[in-house]
A protein has these predicted regions:
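Conserved phosphate-interacting/catalytic interface
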Residues: 1-184, 228-586
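Cys/His-enriched microdomains
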Residues: 189
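Short Cys/His-rich metal-coordination motifs, predominantly Zn2+-binding knuckles/fingers
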Residues: 194-197
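Short catalytic/ligand-binding loop motif for oxyanion handling, primarily in non-cytosolic enzymes
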Residues: 200-202, 336
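Short microdomains enriched in Cys/His and/or Lys/Arg
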Residues: 202-238
Length: 586
């Protein structure tokens, strides 16, 4: 399914002229070898370009469309018209002269084979260069002196003449296309992607730009041990992929990964997305759905229309909510890639799932919180110790949460456990943590079609529900009031009852709340002399909340009940702060 979707995407891009034709690929190139008509090396030209990197401009290799490079392992394998100094000049800095000589001879043989009979000045110049070039004296060549150190560092080189780059010569291009398309004597089979008979690739082109993978590229399809092979087949012949399909899916995936505007990280996974039509507008809108500026009114209106099934125009592109949309998450695994997830739905279907996720997360927010909706990265950060050196969330958790959001399924239990752990460790119920508790139990009830009596719908509200009769929720509200009483009686106090009693109050209320209520009476007595009206206000709150609890406090509370407690505490606290803000405004 993955290879088929990527191959279809390649066909769309090729028809639109947005990707290289079969046999050609984008390659990073640093220098051009300028040849005379008789093949003499005249000059080494630096073709690197200035590109932004952070706040600086740095020289970086230029990306050109060149004959598709081979995927190298430990053997010697030459590329046509573009390679490193070891293959094109017979010199390198690896200290293995015999192997370097073998590389040069392989390159010489390949170019002589392909350029034989090609009638063009560019082809004749390259052929003459390989006939006359002597690797033994190459380091002393005057044309190499200026850039010798950089050339030996491993950057790619290409050929050019006074008429232009050799790889752009029409006769040379035809020679390469004929060579690439020739079936040769390789293995034949039925392609598992296209279903067509023809040559199948034993080694597929490398996938590059996956965070954490080798810079030279990694394999998406790979069989490197006998235990993975069947029926005596070797390497990728165990998953027979035709030459065209192998090139198409790797080219499409590399194009997606090279488009840094539409690549994002979730944990250790590198995530790409695409629409079957190949239009970038779908990627733009999907990316913005997870960005910090999703709250912009025009974007929310656009997404709302798509969620309702209505086509919209974005950046001069008509977006169809029924368009097939794909999301692929890849993680590095040595020289290979692991598929973290692969999701397929309509574009509107994905947006509706994400919008439902945001709706579940909606909860009253503090005045200082600038995020109207909680982006995924901020959500995951609620499970991490912010004082730790590594503030990254668990890689598996990040992928599982994203999958749950995109497929509208249950959130992983590890998300709730991570939040519960941070609340116990820090004794702090932030907006994000309260939102996660609310969303987790809302989705659980929706999935099981059964309300949990320990954390019912009446407590899973956006803001404070003063009519809720749930005892754990009421205990959370009561704890917030007791904390407010202490703060009023002792302004500027360093440690409050939350620092000492929050966890135990949520777990064993019968033990802790009598202590807290006794302490509150002392605080009220102290406060009565300075603000009797405030004492009356607090006493009314205590009377109301205690009457909802009944005669006995619960001896123990389980995890869902503690979730109700945390939501009650958070909503009561935010309601108190909102009243203060409103009083200031008046």
């Amino acid at each position: 399914m993955i290879l088929q979707a990527l191959t279809d995407y390649y066909r769309v891009l090729e028809q639109a002229g947005k990707i290289d034709a079969p046999g050609w690929a984008p390659v990073k190139v640093s220098y051009a070898l300028l040849l005379s008509e008789n093949g003499t090396l005249e000059q080494v030209i630096d073709i690197q370009t200035e590109q932004p990197r952070g706040k600086k401009m740095v020289s970086a290799p230029q990306i050109l469309s060149l004959p598709a490079p081979v995927k190298r392992t430990v053997g010697v394998a030459a590329n046509f018209l573009c390679d490193n100094a070891g293959y094109l000049l017979g010199i390198d800095s690896k200290g293995k002269p015999q192997r370097t000589r073998e590389c040069f001879e392989a390159s010489r043989s390949l170019h002589e084979q392909l350029l034989a009979g090609v009638d063009s000045p560019a082809a004749r110049a390259v052929a003459a260069f390989f006939r006359s070039w002597d690797p033994e004296t190459a380091r002393e060549h005057p044309a190499l002196a200026e850039h010798l150190e950089d050339i030996l560092s491993g950057g790619n080189l290409i050929f050019r003449t006074l008429d232009g780059y050799v790889h752009r010569d029409p006769s040379v291009r035809r020679a390469w296309d004929a060579f690439y398309q020739a079936e040769g004597d390789g293995p034949q089979g039925i392609c598992l992607v296209t279903g067509q008979p023809g040559p199948v690739e034993s080694v597929h082109p490398a996938i590059k730009n996956v965070a954490g993978a080798q810079s030279s590229g990694a394999a998406l399809v790979s069989f490197n041990a006998p235990a993975f092979c069947s029926y005596g087949k070797e390497q990728n012949l165990n998953a027979p992929t035709g030459k065209y399909a192998a090139f198409a899916y790797t080219s499409a995936l590399n194009a997606l990964l090279a488009d840094r505007e539409h690549v994002f990280r979730v944990g250790d996974a590198t995530v790409v997305c695409w629409a079957r039509s190949g239009e970038r507008g779908y990627q733009d809108v999907f990316q913005m759905f997870f960005s910090d500026f999703y709250d912009e009114t025009d974007l929310k209106g656009l997404v709302g229309a798509l969620c309702q099934g209505n086509p919209v125009v974005y950046d001069e592109t008509k977006l169809d909510p029924s368009m097939d949309f794909y999301i692929l998450g890849l993680s590095p695994n040595s020289a290979r890639l692991s598929v973290r997830f692969f999701l397929h739905n309509t574009f509107g279907g994905f947006l509706r799932n994400v919008q439902a996720h945001y709706d579940r997360l909606e909860i009253v927010r503090p005045a200082y919180d600038k995020f109207e909706t909680l982006p995924l990265w901020k959500l995951l950060s609620e499970t991490v110790n912010q004082n730790a050196r590594d503030k990254s969330p668990a890689p598996d958790l990040a992928g599982e949460v994203l999958r749950a959001v995109l497929t509208n399924t249950r959130y992983p239990a590890t998300l709730l456990n991570g939040v519960a752990l941070r609340i116990r460790a820090e004794r702090e119920v932030t907006r994000g943590r309260a939102a996660i508790v609310k969303a987790y139990y809302q989705k659980l009830a929706e999935t099981t079609k059964q309300e949990n009596p320990d954390i019912p719908e009446e407590v899973l509200q956006v803001s404070l529900n003063p009519d809720a009769s749930n005892v754990p929720y009421t205990l959370g509200r009561l704890f917030s009031v007791l904390e407010a009483i202490q703060a009023s009686a002792n302004p500027g106090i360093n440690a409050t009852i939350k620092d000492k009693y929050f966890n135990s109050a949520a777990a064993t209320p019968a033990v802790i709340f009598p202590i807290l209520l006794n302490l509150a009476q002392k605080h009220l007595k102290k406060l009565r002399s300075s603000n009797a009206g405030l004492v009356v206000f607090y006493e009314k709150q205590l009377t109301e909340l205690c009457s909802r609890i009944g005669k006995a406090y619960p001896a123990h509370m389980n995890l869902p009940q503690q979730g109700s407690f945390q939501l009650g505490y958070y909503c009561q606290t935010q309601a108190r702060y909102q009243k203060k803000e409103e009083a200031k405004d008046v």
